[in-house]
Each structure stands twice: as C-alpha cells, then as structure tokens.
C-alpha cells in the first residue's frame, strides 16, 4: 500500500484524526482477507500507521524515525521500530513488511532503496 497524503487523507482519516482515525472499509476488508489467506502485505511511508486500525492485534511496523508519529502508532497498539529510509521492518509472524519511504526520503533514489527491499521481501514471503 503506498503512503503519502492520499493514505492519510483518502484511505483513512489519519491526517485529521490521528489515533482516532477510521480506515477505508475496502482497504480494511482487502488487508484482512489477504492476512487470513496467509498472503504478505507491504505498507510504505505513512500507510503503516493504518495497520493498528486494520488489525485487532499488535504488529511490528515502522514509519521511520519521526517520534511524534511513532508515539501515535504506539498509542494505537503497534510496536514501532525506528528504521532508516533504505531499510524495512518485517513482522515475520504476520507477514507484514513496512518501510519509511518519504517519511524520511529526500529524493526518489533514497525512497527506492527501501521500497525495492519491501517488494523483494513481500515476494519472498509469497513463495
């Protein structure tokens, strides 16, 4: 799931409501169905902040190193793991992969490194 303001405003109400946000019903249904089928999920940028609202159990996720946003996702029930722009955090048990992308990236090359790792890990978890 890509991040950016679209995830925070259109796929959820996170931008306006923070920890009290609602997640788009279709996104929530898709994510839950994929998880129940044992399929891996990849969320990037601010999109991982939606995961605690989608799932009723704690997940290991990252939004990078922004302490204010990390506090919000932990308040929502996630375990936030600080992560550099070029890396990923994997919740092995739940097959969820996250990367900070533009939460930290200053250019597309920086974002691409973490995103490419996310895609590779999601594909590996699919096998």
Give the ranges of each region predicted by the language model.
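Active-site-adjacent pocket-lining segments in enzyme domains
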Residues: 1-127
